[in-house]
Amino acid sequence: MALNLSKKKTIVSKINQISNLALSAIIANSQGISVNKINELRKSGREIGVKMSIVRNTLLSLAIENTAFKCLKKKLKGSTFIAYSTKHPGSGARLFKEFEKKNKKFKITGAVFEGKLLSELEINQLADMPTYEEAIRKLLLTLKISIAGKLIYTLSAIKEKKETS
């Protein structure tokens, strides 16, 4: 479907606005994936604050020109599906990694975090990064275990002191 100039400008403007608000971005080649599967992925993304779109490479290239994601331009080939993480930096990467495991035709081609193009290993690390809530939960659990351990140690020391007296 041919797009007129005003529609193209609208798309570029919209992608540029999202790019300026996003914490990270990840792109993948979605060629060969059914529309139903893509729609399921988009639905999952909306639930966790990931904005996704399939955009022509030339329009995407223009939209990310003056943003932290301009280094993605080198990776724009084929059918590009881009996801921006707006709430947690690893959300999009985690979502795409899970989808890639289930769909062999879906290939992650690049990602950017804090203006840096990430390697495959770094993309995996970004996907594995805990969310804010998960990190707080782990911290509280560690503190709880630490406090409980100190209490047990103190009680056993008091018990030993009473037994020796």
From Swiss-Prot:
GO terms for biological process: translation. InterPro entries: Ribosomal_uL10 (IPR001790), Ribosomal_uL10-like_sf (IPR043141), Ribosomal_uL10_bac (IPR022973), Ribosomal_uL10_bac_type (IPR047865), Ribosomal_uL10_CS_bac (IPR002363). Keywords: Ribonucleoprotein, Ribosomal protein, RNA-binding, rRNA-binding. One of its GO terms (cellular component) is large ribosomal subunit. The keyword Transport does not apply. It holds the Pfam family Ribosomal_L10. The keyword Ribosomal protein applies. GO terms for molecular function: large ribosomal subunit rRNA binding; structural constituent of ribosome. It comes from the Bacteria. Forms part of the ribosomal stalk, playing a central role in the interaction of the ribosome with GTP-bound translation factors. Belongs to the universal ribosomal protein uL10 family. Part of the ribosomal stalk of the 50S ribosomal subunit. The N-terminus interacts with L11 and the large rRNA to form the base of the stalk. The C-terminus forms an elongated spine to which L12 dimers bind in a sequential fashion forming a multimeric L10(L12)X complex. This is Large ribosomal subunit protein uL10.
